[in-house]
C-alpha cells in the first residue's frame, strides 16, 4: 500500500530497512526507532495518539515524516502527510478512517503527497 502513494519502504540514503507491524503496544515497543528505518503500522487509525506517544517515548524523532494511506489502490485513495508530532491531530482534523496504513520515516518525503503535508506552523 505505501507504493500506491509513491512511498518506497527503502531508499538509498533514507532507509536501509523496514518493519511492518500491527499497531499493538507490545509490537510498537519492539520495533527499531532509527532515522534509517521505515515503520509501517497496520490497523493503527484508532491507536494513533497512543502509538505516537510510545514511539516518541522510545526516542523517535518527533519531526519524522509520516503518511496515512487510506483505501490504498482504490479509486478514492487518500494520502495525508505530516510529521510524527502532528499525526494524531492532523488525522483527526481531516477525518482519517480505516482501512488505512501508516508509514513513518524519511521515505515519506519521496511521495508526491509530501508537497501537500499538513504541519501546523510549517
For the regions a protein language model found, what residue spans apply to each?
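Catalytic cores of RNA-modifying enzymes
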Residues: 1-21
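A contiguous loop/helix-start segment that scaffolds small-molecule binding in enzyme catalytic cores
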Residues: 15-17, 22-122
Amino acid at each position: 500500500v505505501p507504493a500506491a502513494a509513491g512511498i518506497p519502504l527503502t531508499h538509498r540514503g533514507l532507509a536501509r530497512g523496514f518493519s511492518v507491524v500491527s499497531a499493538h503496544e507490545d509490537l510498537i515497543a519492539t520495533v527499531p526507532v532509527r532515522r534509517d528505518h521505515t515503520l509501517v503500522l497496520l490497523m493503527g487509525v484508532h491507536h494513533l495518539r497512543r502509538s505516537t506517544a510510545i514511539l516518541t517515548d522510545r526516542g523517535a524523532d518527533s519531526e519524522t515524516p509520516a503518511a496515512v494511506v487510506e483505501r490504498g489502490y482504490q479509486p478514492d485513495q487518500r494520502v495525508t502527510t505530516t510529521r510524527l508530532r502532528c499525526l494524531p491531530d492532523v488525522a483527526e482534523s481531516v477525518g482519517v478512517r480505516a482501512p488505512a496504513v501508516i508509514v513513518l520515516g524519511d521515505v515519506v518525503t519521496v511521495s508526491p503527497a509530501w508537497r501537500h503535508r499538513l504541519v501546523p506552523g510549517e
